[in-house]
A protein has these predicted regions:
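ATP-binding N-lobe of GHMP and related small-molecule kinases
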Residues: 1-96, 115, 119-124, 151, ...
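Short, basic/glycine-rich phosphate-binding loops at helix/coil junctions
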Residues: 48-61, 109, 131, 195-203
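Contiguous, small/hydrophobic- and glycine-enriched helical/loop subdomains that border
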Residues: 84, 110-147
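Conserved, helical-rich catalytic subdomain that frames metal- and/or nucleotide-binding sites
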Residues: 142, 146-229, 242-281
Length: 281
């Protein structure tokens, strides 16, 4: 095998509770990660030298800080692999939307090159490597909808009803660092257990602050809540609502304000990347 095409799916935070601040400055979180069946796509072509090249449908994303390049080089360095690759990233998810696109791209790169380079690393090893790139990367490496704790890296897989979601992203880029450093951020939500999950009140502790700092997020939520209960994912700017069926979601999408991007996706308990990898066996 010399080529491989794999999806890099989005996620939603069905809730995001901040339960405290750690000594290292990071925050302890509890969240429910819902994987979606929609996202970016990556095309890998193996090279017989050690060069790693990236091209992207959005040329502005091709730089040394891109998580795809960082993931590929990390894997190469960790294993001493003498192969390289050409990677094409078809970027479909909005940047800075709270949908995990960059982390998902990194995870798919680790999974894809582990296969293409025939490295044979375990999922645990790939998840550990991924954590050094970002707290959400292990979620996408493991590829299961999960209840998460810690900084988001302690994952317990969970099966949820696979609902239809409308995801809407207003025209703004929320700074995650600004949100988590802000003195007004809620940081004392009471911890819940997995057993308490369905009897607890779900909310996003970042949402009140983000709505204040980025009024367009509040306006977008006010629009979406006309159709279904709505909330923000991650630190925004994307917001979402669950719908009973595709038709009702399409009706709302047809009324989308011109300043927003939107898409409909289905929640899935296992990432499509696993089916795509299995198809290469």
């Amino acid at each position: 095998m010399t080529t491989l095409t794999l999806p890099a799916v989005a996620k939603l935070n069905l809730f995001l509770h901040i339960t405290g601040r750690r000594a290292d400055g990071y925050h302890n979180l509890q969240t429910l990660f819902q994987l979606l069946d929609t996202g970016d796509e990556l095309h890998f072509t193996r090279r017989n030298d050690t060069n790693i090249n990236l091209s992207c449908s959005d040329a502005s994303l091709v730089n040394e800080q891109n998580l795809v390049l960082r993931a590929a080089r990390l894997l190469q360095q960790h294993t001493g692999c003498k192969l390289g690759c050409d990677i094409v990233l078809d970027k479909r998810l909005p940047m800075g939307g709270g949908l995990g696109g960059g982390s998902s791209d990194a995870a798919t790169t680790l999974l894809g090159l582990n296969k293409l380079w025939q490295l044979g690393l375990s999922i645990d090893t790939l998840a550990e490597l991924g954590l050094s790139l970002g707290a959400d990367v292990p979620l996408f490496v493991r590829g299961q909808t999960s209840f998460a704790e810690g900084v988001g890296e302690k994952l317990q897989p969970i099966n949820l009803a696979e609902k239809v979601y409308l995801v809407v992203t207003p025209d703004c880029h929320v700074s995650t660092a600004e949100v988590f450093q802000h003195p007004d951020l809620i940081r004392d939500t009471k911890e819940i257990s997995l057993a308490d999950l369905h009897s607890s009140s779900w909310h996003n502790d970042c949402q009140p602050l983000v709505e204040r700092l980025y009024p367009i997020v509040a306006i977008t939520l006010q629009w979406l809540v006309q159709y279904a209960p709505s909330q923000m994912t991650g630190t925004g700017a994307s917001v979402f609502a669950a719908f009973p069926d595709q038709t009702s979601a399409q009706h709302a999408l047809a009324q989308l304000p011109p300043s927003c991007r939107g898409f409909i996706a289905k929640g899935v308990n296992q990432s499509p990347v696993w089916a795509a990898l299995a198809d290469t066996e």
